[in-house]
Amino acid sequence: MRKTIAYYHLPGLFEFYELYEAFLPIYREHREYFYDWCGIGSIYGAPADCIWGGGRIGSGEHGVQEVMNLMSEYGISARLTFSNSLLREEHLADEKCNALCKALNDSEGSSNGVIVHSDILARYIKKHYPNLYLVSSTTKVLTDFNDFLNEVKREDFQYVVPDFRLNKVFDKLVKLTDKEKDKVEFLCNECCWFGCYDRKNCYEIVSRQNLGEDCPDHVCVAPDSQSGYRFSKAMENPVFISVGDIRNTYMPMGFSNFKIEGRGLGSALVLEFLLYYMIKPEYQIHVREDIYLDNMLDIF
């Protein structure tokens, strides 16, 4: 069934609090700036020092109540990125991570969720925080379509984020049922090398670091890794999902959930993601001016 609204799942629940504090009033007060076919499905992230964290190292100085007040004010679902792949039973007693889950579980308004990798954690959250929905993390690196399909069929998960390399296997995606399509959340702006063979190891090192293990940072194996993340480079990825792709291919096919990555990047770049995916081109300058751009700003 063709979808009429695309929902974006945005990075930086804690990491980019100040950005959303400035952006969300514009989202509410100037809907004419925004494409009329899109909305915010959730904002995801984790603060620093969360042993359940994964994907990226969390950051941000704002407390959970402050963050949840902002999300509640705008009726937006909050998601904790707790996608550590190496959790053991003894880690489940962590006070900070449990307190965060309790805050989201007890929050009134929009339902909130947790992005998970570990089945141990998934079972624990279902038992102790039943109001939270679960999202299967892309850190599972499910590159085989049948493995991904089995994940989609699991009743535990409200959403499943496939590996980005499955973004455009349209001959298989089109065969999903409407219920299955509603669960799929595509990662749009991945800059990782399409041929990467070390992605799972990259995520595992982050999991170890979040657990406090002393291990070196992952060394990226991409041919051009020295340039870091560039949005222009991500756009050249063969499985990059553009605004046109969303409107002309995915929504007509029945898909409506799209994840924007960027927790480990700078807020200026995340703003560019928001502008590209949500704001009509003629209004992008207005949003920049509302947030940071004035007639006295120097860059040199």
Regions found by a protein language model. Give the residues of each.
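Active-site pocket-lining/capping segments in soluble small-molecule metabolic enzymes
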Residues: 1-151, 157-300
